[in-house]
């Protein structure tokens, strides 16, 4: 379901895929070729949520903010199943593993990988191209070329799947 909040209307690129049973409300911007998967909730009723190009937000994720603290996802970000993102910044090509939580004013560096089930506390900065894991998340190591290749594959596959599902939606209309 997509609807405004007060005077703010979601802005969704025509090429983006929005799965059924997804809720998007308020001051939300979703970029080209992004995909928002089943049962996810993106609320822009407190501050803006800005989602770049080729971002995938997987099933059952929740994106929200605190007053005056936007939520920003740069291009080609992967957000795993059941992730909570709250007023944080996720830099380009980062991957947030399934079931992770990233809290207010945390920043995930470009190309960083947050391991499944991690908690990134308020204000924590994760450096670019590192693997961070745990509750609270701690940097474990630098990413290997194989890690980076795998992250790129996941992002690419979700972009392709999103376009496939979008074509199915068009056929149903």
Question: What is each of the regions a protein language model found here?
Answer:
Residues 1-15, 124-130, 135-173:
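Terminal amphipathic alpha-helical/low-complexity segments used for targeting or macromolecular assembly
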Residues 4-127, 131-132, 137-139:
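Structural signal for interior beta-strand "rungs" in well-ordered beta-sheet cores
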């Amino acid at each position: 379901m997509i609807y405004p909040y007060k005077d703010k209307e979601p802005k969704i690129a025509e090429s983006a895929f929005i799965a059924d049973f997804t809720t998007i409300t308020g001051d939300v911007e979703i970029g080209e070729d992004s995909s928002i998967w089943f049962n996810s909730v993106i609320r822009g009723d407190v501050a803006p949520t800005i989602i770049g190009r080729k971002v995938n937000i997987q099933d059952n994720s929740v994106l929200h903010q605190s007053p005056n603290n936007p939520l920003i996802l740069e291009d080609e970000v992967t957000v795993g199943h059941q992730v909570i993102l709250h007023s944080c910044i996720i830099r380009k090509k980062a991957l947030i593993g399934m079931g992770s939580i990233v809290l207010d004013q945390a920043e995930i560096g470009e190309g960083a990988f947050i391991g499944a089930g991690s908690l990134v506390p308020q204000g924590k900065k994760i450096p670019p191209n590192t693997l961070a894991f745990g509750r609270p998340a701690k940097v474990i190591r630098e990413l290997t070329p194989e890690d980076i290749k795998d992250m790129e594959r996941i992002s690419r596959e979700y972009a392709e799947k999103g376009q496939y599902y979008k074509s199915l939606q068009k056929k149903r209309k």
